Amino acid sequence: MNTENLLIIDGSSFLHRAYHGYANANIIDESGRQISAIYGLVEMFRKLERKITSTAWICVFDPAKSKSFRYDIYPEYKKNRTKYEDLEYQKEIVPKIVSHLGITTIVDDRYEADDIIGTLAVSLFDKCSSILIATGDKDLAQLVNNKVKLINTMNDEVTDIKGVNKRFNVNPEQIIDYLSIVGDTSDNIPGVLGCGAVTASKLLQEYKTLDEILKNIENLKPSIKTKFINSSKE
């Protein structure tokens, strides 16, 4: 595989978007099961192919049935998400279909797509001139660097280091700490109650890391200090 200009696709993100975007397509297979999301996914790939020139594509999916280690750490993880029966079947068969399109496809029962995408971005860094990650997931902003960029195919917006700075007011390497403070509602992960994006970015601009914020908790404004202490008790 020539990975000089690599495109990594967050297949699970694409499939969920296709499920909602093509909800009225009503496309069924020979057994009468809905496959509108898969049809939409393929259409999204076609549009992507017209927009992007890459020497290699890799598409990564979440496991369809098994749960990652995150559920053991935090049982409430993603508990707020609605399950759609007609999507669950499509999750099971889509990796094989994408593979038949000639696209390198990866799914691992132990890990989510994000984990694998992160591993690929790091392990293939020295072998690539550029890595473009197609996703709508803000978590992956932590991977952005001088070679790695994100593209949101909803609006064709490409996010580089400056783009991360502009959107979050922090650097890519601070995204994990930023999300730890503000929380992630899409994954049902609480942050520091009462600390929003503005507070989080200001704290990280001053102290650089969450560890340093906690080490200097006595120096924080009383109201912010209280929020951190109260959140640590929950």
Regions found by a protein language model. Give the residues of each.
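Noncatalytic, basic helical substrate-engagement surface that gates or grips nucleic-acid strands
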Residues: N2-A134, L140-V158
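Non-catalytic nucleic-acid-binding/docking modules located in mid-to-C-terminal regions
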Residues: T3, K51-I58, T82, L101-I103, ...
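Acidic, divalent-metal-coordinating active-site segment for phosphoryl/phosphodiester hydrolysis
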Residues: K138-D139, V198
